[in-house]
């Protein structure tokens, strides 16, 4: 009973962070299963495993996206690493609103349940994660599936908004003595910017899907031209949320990578303030570029010119971050432990994804490439090899601090190389498919595309082996005995550590700080 009470009613940021990690792992495995089903269907031309049920294919695509974005990356990055380490890094005893933190987590399992139900009732929700009307309207999806998906999004949105309020309050009001804003670790800054993005963008999504809900069930016509509505309005509202959302997914990763690169290069991050302002700029600019997802809907040519230019401007702060990471490594004594491998892999592959993003920013080119596999390749490079690599990097970096046990280094490196090989083999060929005009969200294709698709599917099977490796690492780490105890600061002598989490024992006490730490100076 005591255990049940501890985990169900927890107000401790570490316990809630651990719950987020477990939840993210479960959702991640489910999302991966769906992606493998997608790749099995696309492994060769013709109908493969879904027996010609093309609606089911789109249900898989939709569920894969929602699971990975709202139930894997966001809970693990913001809920997991954010909850665990933001209070420790700023020298706070806990989050500002511990019970709000608890409800933020417990809104997610019901939300996940609603999403899974949506896939199981009637013919499921085969709309893609964008849920565009009229396809998501009552005439095209007549059952309750889309409505369930909408309620699922509402719940996970409320969870994220409450969480972001909590993070903003915590970071502004609960820093320890001497911890000025300009001394905040970069991961804390990244979570702060992310929280503001969530707070400003999610209500817009909530408005859009609520209007969709009333269009479907109460005969309103927000998105129906027959009653004076406009489906393009939905696209504007959705992408005004959807574009900041992709920065929400990657920004905490930026913070994690900054810490890791600094630690394993043995020197402070190059250009700390530049890094902070780059993140803030990315956050601000993220709200000014949404229509680049809509170049094909007949926007005015001047509008397209603006959104092309604005999108390219985002590459500037992003480039500042990448070159600062490289400058941090420059001349350092680099140790290629597993976290650093994932961090370097992140920098390399995120850069590739960013470059294809610059290609797609050109409205003229995008009209040819829109809704092809080129776009799929682009965002999977920044998510599947950006966000996910950052998650793995953060896991290996902090796992000793979280569980108080060291992970098997060799197996971690094997996990990295298998995953690195698998994801590249999966997504690199998609650039070629897109350039040849293979459209997204279609379960069958002409024979000409067979070769690259077969390669891509093979790559996804390798990625699954990598994920199995990862869970073996987790199992070994959790079941290792007292001889595998983790030092307070496993990566450096405590005197050389630049952030607070390495000053406390591994794992930290239930109440981290007996008295709040005072910060005298920081090495940067």
Swiss-Prot record:
Chief localization: mitochondrion
Residues that coordinate or bind Ca(2+): 41, 46, 443
GO cellular component: mitochondrial inner membrane; respiratory chain complex IV
One Gene Ontology term from the biological process aspect of the record: electron transport coupled proton transport
GO molecular function, one term: metal ion binding
Protein residues bound to O2: 247
Localization annotation: Mitochondrion inner membrane
Binding of heme a3, residues: 378
EC number: 7.1.1.9
Per UniProt, location of the 1'-histidyl-3'-tyrosine (His-Tyr) cross-link in this chain: 243-247
Transmembrane segments: 18-38, 66-86, 103-123, 148-168, 186-206, 237-257, 269-289, 312-332, 340-360, 379-399, 414-434, 458-478
Keywords: Calcium, Copper, Electron transport, Heme, Iron, Magnesium, Membrane, Metal-binding, Mitochondrion, Mitochondrion inner membrane, Respiratory chain, Translocase, Transmembrane, Transmembrane helix, Transport
Membrane topology: Multi-pass membrane protein
Cofactor, how bound (note): Binds 2 heme A groups non-covalently per subunit.
InterPro entries according to UniProt: Cyt_c_oxase-like_su1_dom, Cyt_c_oxase-like_su1_sf, Cyt_C_Oxase_1, Cyt_c_Oxase_su1_BS, Cyt_c_oxase_su1_dom, Cyt_c_oxidase_su1_bac
Binding site for Cu cation: 243, 292-293
Cofactor(s) recorded in Swiss-Prot or TrEMBL: heme; Cu cation
Reactions catalysed, as given in the entry: 4 Fe(II)-[cytochrome c] + O2 + 8 H(+)(in) = 4 Fe(III)-[cytochrome c] + 2 H2O + 4 H(+)(out)
Pathway assigned to this chain's UniProt record: Energy metabolism; oxidative phosphorylation
Amino acids binding Fe(II)-heme a: 64, 380
Oligomer and partners: Component of the cytochrome c oxidase (complex IV, CIV), a multisubunit enzyme composed of a catalytic core of 3 subunits and several supernumerary subunits. The complex exists as a monomer or a dimer and forms supercomplexes (SCs) in the inner mitochondrial membrane with ubiquinol-cytochrome c oxidoreductase (cytochrome b-c1 complex, complex III, CIII).
Similarity comment text for this entry: Belongs to the heme-copper respiratory oxidase family.
Function description: Component of the cytochrome c oxidase, the last enzyme in the mitochondrial electron transport chain which drives oxidative phosphorylation. The respiratory chain contains 3 multisubunit complexes succinate dehydrogenase (complex II, CII), ubiquinol-cytochrome c oxidoreductase (cytochrome b-c1 complex, complex III, CIII) and cytochrome c oxidase (complex IV, CIV), that cooperate to transfer electrons derived from NADH and succinate to molecular oxygen, creating an electrochemical gradient over the inner membrane that drives transmembrane transport and the ATP synthase.
Alphabetical list of PANTHER family matching this protein: CYTOCHROME C OXIDASE SUBUNIT 1
Name of the molecule in the record: Cytochrome c oxidase subunit 1
Protein species of origin: Beta vulgaris
């Amino acid at each position: 009973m005591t255990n049940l009470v501890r985990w169900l009613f927890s107000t401790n940021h570490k316990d809630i962070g651990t719950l987020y990690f477990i939840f993210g792992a479960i959702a991640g495995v489910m999302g991966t299963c769906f992606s493998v089903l997608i790749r099995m269907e696309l492994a060769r031309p013709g109908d493969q495993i879904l027996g010609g049920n093309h609606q089911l294919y789109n249900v898989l695509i939709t569920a894969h996206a929602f699971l990975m974005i709202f139930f894997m990356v966001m809970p693990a990055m913001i809920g997991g690493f954010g909850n665990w380490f933001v209070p420790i890094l700023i020298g706070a005893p806990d989050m500002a609103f511990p019970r709000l933190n608890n409800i933020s987590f417990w809104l997610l399992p019901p939300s996940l349940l609603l999403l899974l139900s949506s896939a199981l009732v009637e013919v499921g929700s085969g709309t893609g994660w964008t849920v565009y009307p009229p396809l998501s309207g009552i005439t095209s999806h007549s059952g309750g599936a889309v409505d369930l998906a909408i309620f699922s999004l509402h719940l996970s949105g409320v969870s994220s908004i409450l969480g972001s309020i909590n993070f903003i309050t915590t970071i502004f009001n609960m820093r320890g003595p001497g911890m000025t804003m300009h001394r905040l670790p970069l991961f804390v800054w990244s979570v702060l910017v992310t929280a503001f993005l969530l707070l400003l963008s999610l209500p817009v999504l909530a408005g859009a899907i609520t209007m969709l809900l009333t269009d479907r069930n109460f005969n309103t016509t927000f998105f129906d031209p027959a009653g004076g509505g406009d489906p393009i309005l939905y696209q504007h509202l959705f992408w005004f949320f959807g574009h900041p959302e992709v920065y929400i997914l990657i920004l905490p990763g930026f913070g994690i990578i900054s810490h890791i690169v600094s630690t394993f290069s043995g020197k402070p991050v190059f250009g700390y303030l530049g890094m902070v302002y780059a993140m803030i700029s990315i956050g601000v600019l993220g709200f000014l570029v949404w229509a680049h997802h809509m170049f094909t809907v007949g926007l005015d040519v001047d509008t397209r010119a603006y959104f092309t230019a604005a999108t390219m401007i985002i590459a500037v702060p992003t480039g500042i971050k990448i070159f600062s990471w490289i400058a941090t490594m420059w001349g350092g004594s680099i140790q290629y432990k597993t976290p650093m491998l994932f961090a370097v892999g992140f920098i390399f592959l995120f850069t590739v994804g960013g470059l294809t993003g610059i290609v797609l920013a050109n409205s003229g080119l995008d009209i040819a490439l829109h809704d092809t596999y080129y776009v799929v390749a682009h965002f999977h490079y920044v998510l599947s090899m950006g966000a996910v690599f950052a998650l793995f990097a953060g896991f290996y970096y902090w796992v000793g601090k979280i569980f108080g046990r060291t992970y098997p280094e060799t197996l971690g490196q094997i996990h990295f190389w298998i995953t690195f090989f698998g994801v590249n083999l999966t997504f690199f060929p998609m650039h070629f498919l897109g350039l040849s005009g293979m459209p997204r969200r279609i379960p069958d294709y002409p024979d000409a595309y067979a070769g690259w698709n077969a390669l891509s599917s093979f790559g996804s099977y390798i990625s699954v082996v990598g994920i199995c490796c990862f869970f073996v690492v987790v199992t070994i780490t959790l079941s290792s005995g007292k001889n595998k105890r983790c030092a307070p600061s496993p990566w450096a002598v405590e005197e050389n550590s630049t952030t607070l989490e390495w000053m406390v024992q591994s794992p930290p006490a239930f109440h981290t700080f007996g008295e709040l730490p005072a910060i005298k100076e920081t090495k940067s």
